[in-house]
Amino acid sequence: VKENKSWIFKKKQIEENIKKKKFILVDSRIQDRFEGRVEEPRPGLKRGHIKNAVNIPFKDCVDLEKNMLKDKSELEKLFNQKNIRNTDDVVFYCGSGTSCAVNAFTWYKITGKSPQIYMGSWSEFGKK
């Protein structure tokens, strides 16, 4: 197994994107965490989200009764509702770089594109 560095984004790239908006940043955490209405489960993190990010909670991509991803058409609709098109460049993050893998795989299912993830996620970017 060989790491593909083009799939993994660093904090510096995220900070540059806040200014230049080269890609869409998708926060995969629950809406209450995204909007800063609840405390973060990890100490030392502020509430909220990375500027310009859109929120698609990873659980919204899953059919909880079947315990699998929703149908492709449902997933496309979910992303389209957030003004994300198949041709967009998208980077996913979450709280720790784990649950955003669900959204990243969803993106692959929808588009066939290799997903990109900000591994540092909110646990790095959201430090007080």
Language-model segments: what does each one mean?
Residues 1-128:
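Cytosolic catalytic domains that perform sulfur/thiol-centered chemistry
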